[in-house]
């Protein structure tokens, strides 16, 4: 099964990465995740953001990620501890 975390987008780092304030973790995750972590985006399901990474800008990411409640499905972790994940908007009540 895929590990999943939820939280609020905090800071855009680059055109394909941001920092998330983790507020929820899926029961049964294989790994443990800190309260704040860098996400490198492997894929998106975010209204207002193209599926094509080459179209992304810092401004695009800011408009759909900052202060949004996000779901991150973890693909892998870098040696530095950054998470590579598919990112989508998540409803607060149902995660």
Each language-model region and where it sits:
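Small beta-barrel nucleic-acid-binding modules, primarily SNase/OB-fold domains
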Residues: 1-95
């Amino acid at each position: 099964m895929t590990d999943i975390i939820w939280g609020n987008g905090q800071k855009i780092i680059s055109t394909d990465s941001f920092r998330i304030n983790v507020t929820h973790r899926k029961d049964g995750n294989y790994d443990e995740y800190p309260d704040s972590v860098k996400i490198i985006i492997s894929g998106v399901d975010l209204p207002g953001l193209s599926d094509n990474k080459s179209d992304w800008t810092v401004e695009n990411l800011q408009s759909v990620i900052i202060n949004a409640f996000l779901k991150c499905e973890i693909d892998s972790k870098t040696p530095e501890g950054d998470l590579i994940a598919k990112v989508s908007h998540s409803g607060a009540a149902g995660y």
